[in-house]
Amino acid sequence: MKCFKLVLLCVLAGLLVIAAAPARSQQMKPQPLTLGLQCTGGDCPLLKGIPQTAGMRSGFVRLEPGQTVGWHTTGKNEESLVILKGRGEARLEGQAARPFSAPALVYIPPAMKHNVANTGREVLEYVYVVAPATNVP
């Protein structure tokens, strides 16, 4: 009987916690915000996805001459790079490198392995935006 009362007490406590918590849709509703672009080097995430956004991620990258971000893929997501400063190239697996210089926009389709390199003599700075692709074959 003592064990039954303990289990019942735990169940009731759990129900109270669930009832007191806001609805999941209210917890995950993204809110407008403004972020600075201070980054001392490498990849500095800005928007980290759910629940901060509805699925989009974003960050600021600062590469010294000769540096790369490394080969990677964004899976089923597409990516845009907004080039703010410097020169570089987008290296896409199986394709010729695509050189760019600021100001520029680079688009990378879903599931494409890629790398970004600073090929210039000054710092390369860009903002990346990764978002779920809704029309992936």
PLM ranges: what are they?
Residues 7-18:
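Bacterial N-terminal signal peptides
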Residues 57, 77, 110:
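Exposed loop/turn and edge beta-strand positions of beta-sandwich/beta-sheet ligand-binding modules
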